[in-house]
Structure formats: structure tokens, C-alpha cells
């Protein structure tokens, strides 16, 4: 049984806390937020002690697993301090995405976890679904063959004022980039163009061409300008033996074998299937707890801190490309 704590009791923090209360291998023992009103309300809701200091919470409650769901500038600047404090206290950490808006902080967190032998995961919940696993199984079973290309699209409507001109790239695309690398491996180079939709002061829509280290090519479109009534996510992966399309996280995955006109389809079932976006959080959080509880090695963590770091590195390469007028940027050259 893993003793768990959630630090950062906003909307996402409540989802993490709820998921821990529903996990057979976890016990939620405390919540924490530096805003006392939020901490107290969450403590009362979940029936656990509350704290306003993460460091004091770790010392008092001795958790095994800590969720870091704080926000900050560009939705991630407040991840670093409570994460490092958790590692210093000997805790395994599941952090929200993006891992950090500062690649130097992200690198330090990943390296600290590795040095201390602690498990570090990032909430890449968009691919923690039965549909994504089915698509991956088709690939692992050789149904796709040698990789050719990957096309990814992710968009939601987010029209409020945001922190920075690159907020959309940094906050949304850890999901899309991680999905592409999950199926196709590390991204080698990118070329990105971005635009500010009418009335907006941020780069709210972008288009990226890329090459993977294995030679396959890809494309990513993302936007904060599409209203929420539309389907929001689509990943297409093609190879020499077949192609699959993985849609809306949990809704459907379709395999198109190269040598037949008959396709295979996984459709989320009405009974016992995913019912809402929350289910992706529950699946991802429970997967992390199960791995920690089973004694998995840090390098075996699915959706690891290193994956989060490499997704953000790609995004920072995309940003540099935008700044350089769409120039091709080598991902390995990006360190901050």
C-alpha cells in the first residue's frame, strides 16, 4: 500500500486525489496547497490532514508517492521546488505536464530522481487508455512494419488571456509530442510555423514538420482556437505493412492492414468503458502507483520524467524554429 500526497489543490489536484482514493494500492494520507483556503477545503472533502507547506507535509506524513499538481507561470514554473523537496524526502513523484517551463529545472529534476533511485513519472494521461494500448499492441505485433510517417493533431478551445506568447506550445503539446514519440521514437529535427488567430496575442495555432531519429517523418498541428464541440485529438501512424488511426484518446483505434480491405476497430464500450476525461487521469495515476508498488526500476516507468523532459525539449526546439522563421532545428542542440 502506497501512502500518497497531492501538492497543489486546484482542479487537477482534485482529480489526482480522487484517483488515489479509488486505487487499491494507494492510500491518500494528506493534501497540500500554499493557499490555506484551498488546502483546508480539499482536506475536508477527502477526509485527510491538510498542509500549506510541502516540506512540512512530507516530513509529517512520510508519503511513498507524491503528485505535484501545482501551476505557476506557463502552468509549470511551480513544479520544481515541491518536486525537489519530495525527492530529498525520499518520495517517488508523479508530476503534471509540462514537466517545467525551464529545461534546466526539468533536467535537474530528472537527474536527481535517477541519482537517488526514485521513480519519476509525468501525467501523460492522453495515451493511458485501452485504445492507445491496442494501437501499440498492433505496432508491437508487427502489424505496422517499418515506420513511414506519423500525423498528429490536437486542439482545444482556450480563449482566455494566457501567460506568454508560447503558452499554447508549452502547455498543450507535451501530450501530442509524447504520443508521437511513444509510437515512433525520438524526434531528431523540427520546422515550425505558428500564427496568432484574429484578436489573440499568443501563438495560438502551430504546424510542425519533423523527422524522427529512425528516419520516419511526421507532422503535428495544434491549436487553442478550435471550440470544444469538435473531436480534439487524432494520431495516424503508417508503416510498410499497415496503418492505424487512434482518435480522441479513448474513443476509437482503427487498424488498416496493407494486404487486405478488411480493417480492425477497437471502439470504447458502452458498459465498463471510459466515460469521461477523468478516466484518463485515473488510468495513468493507477498505472504509476502499480509500478511503484510492484518495485519497478525507475527506468521502467511508463510515462517517465525523462519522457516529459524530452517532450519539452522538442517543444523548445519548435519555439526556436518559430523564432527563426521556420528554420530546421536539431532537437539535440536544445538545452535550455
Residue positions per predicted region:
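A contiguous active-site-proximal alpha/beta segment in oxidoreductase catalytic domains
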Residues: 99-160
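Hydrophobic residues in well-ordered beta-strands that form the structural core
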Residues: 52, 95, 120-122, 246
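N-terminal Rossmann-like dinucleotide-binding module
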Residues: 1-46, 289
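Contiguous beta-strand/loop segments that form the cofactor/metal-binding neighborhood of enzyme cores
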Residues: 171, 175-252, 280-297, 336
